[in-house]
Amino acid sequence: MILQLLVPVDGALPGPVLTEIAALYSTNHAFFELSGDFPDPDRITVEQVAASLADELAHDGAEILLARSAGRLVGLAATLDRNPAAAPGDDDPWIGLLLIDATAHREGYGRAVATLVEDRFRAAGRTGVQIAVLDNNPKGLAFWQSQGYSPVRRAKDRELGRDCTVLRKPLDTA
């Protein structure tokens, strides 16, 4: 598996890649029903995905990483170099979204992508990583806790003010 950085071309996302990403999002209608990120999770459009990705990339230090296995797009991670709403001294990077093709759930891709993202942060000298999991997503919370993330506080997400649990994982650098 490899991670590829999604790079806009002339300020826009490449059409074929955007179509692939929209297909990935469309497989995850159950997650998007929970999150409320799209008006109709059963009909997510390329234009909606483009707008969502543009919103993610508008933040300083944001990256979209595409996960490919044997050339197939199996997942996506949106990361932030630092949470813009973090308290002073909280310099951990964030995983804003980890999305795996729903037709490939329970095949180890989520764990593999999370590990690759953590490895990128570790290689950059980061000592921890955080994620906020929506309270109405117990499967997501269980996944992240199984990856070694521990709850550190309660919060509201920055987009829609939804209740979340913030988790953190220390990254060993040795």
Language-model features: where?
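Conserved GNAT acetyl-CoA-binding A-motif
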Residues: 121-132
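Helix-turn-helix
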Residues: 140
